[in-house]
Amino acid sequence: MSKNIVMLGLPGVGKGTNADIMVEDFKLPHISTGDIFRSAMANHTELGDKAKSFMDAGNLVPDEITNGIVNERLNEADVKDAGGFILDGYPRNTSQADSLESFLRSIQQKLNAVIYLDASEKTVTNRMLGRGREDDTPEVVAHRIDVAKKETMPLVEYYRNKGSLYTIDANGEVSVVYPKIKKLVSNL
């Protein structure tokens, strides 16, 4: 059976960090929209330049651009060969969630788990300011958290209502949080 997983949570909550460990344990590709966009920006692609203008202002990249990139990535051979994926940073709203569900249905797949890493704003703010990314200024961090709460939090209810949401307290260190994730994914 596939292990198709979405990681949800505020920016800086540890989605990417925990997903990277899951890659080692479960041999699933980690698909991070943030990494895709940062790579495109570094290479000054057309998409990268468009994404940069949104990200520099702390805003989300428009759905139509993001949906297309994610669908292309989910269709690549390594994802098909692995029998699953870990999505980090997508979907960010119910429109993207509907697009993902529709795409997965078109390839006879479905989501197996949506893991919501729940942490306080103080925790995620401190983590983001401590990671040293160019776009992590105090003002941009505060704005990103506000945007993410408005856009992402309805997803928590969306997936809770579908019965696929698993909430994990992510206020602690990775050494405390990750074993809970590993146990959950092992039982899928």
Curated annotation (Swiss-Prot):
Domain of life: Bacteria
EC id: 2.7.4.3
Gene3D superfamilies membership: P-loop containing nucleotide triphosphate hydrolases
InterPro entries registered for this protein in UniProt: Adenylat/UMP-CMP_kin, Adenylat_kinase_CS, P-loop_NTPase
Region LID, annotated ranges: 130-136
Keywords from the named record: ATP-binding, Cytoplasm, Kinase, Nucleotide biosynthesis, Nucleotide-binding, Transferase
Chain residues that bind AMP: 33, 38, 59-61, 89-92, 96, 133, 144
One Gene Ontology MF term: ATP binding
GO process terms (BP): AMP salvage
Keyword Transcription regulation: no
PROSITE patterns membership: ADENYLATE_KINASE (PS00113)
Region (NMP): 32-61
Pathway info: Purine metabolism; AMP biosynthesis via salvage pathway; AMP from ADP: step 1/1
Binding residue positions for ATP: 12-17, 131, 172
Subcellular location: Cytoplasm
Enzyme class: transferase
SUPFAM superfamilies in the cross-refs: P-loop containing nucleoside triphosphate hydrolases
GO CC entries: cytoplasm
Reactions that this protein is recorded to catalyse: AMP + ATP = 2 ADP
NCBIfam families: PRK00279.1-3, PRK14527.1, PRK14531.1
Stated family: Belongs to the adenylate kinase family.
Domain notes: Consists of three domains, a large central CORE domain and two small peripheral domains, NMPbind and LID, which undergo movements during catalysis. The LID domain closes over the site of phosphoryl transfer upon ATP binding. Assembling and dissambling the active center during each catalytic cycle provides an effective means to prevent ATP hydrolysis.
Cited function: Catalyzes the reversible transfer of the terminal phosphate group between ATP and AMP. Plays an important role in cellular energy homeostasis and in adenine nucleotide metabolism.
Protein name: Adenylate kinase
Source species: Oenococcus oeni (strain ATCC BAA-331 / PSU-1)
Taxonomic placement: Bacteria, Bacillati, Bacillota, Bacilli, Lactobacillales
Gene from which this protein is expressed: adk
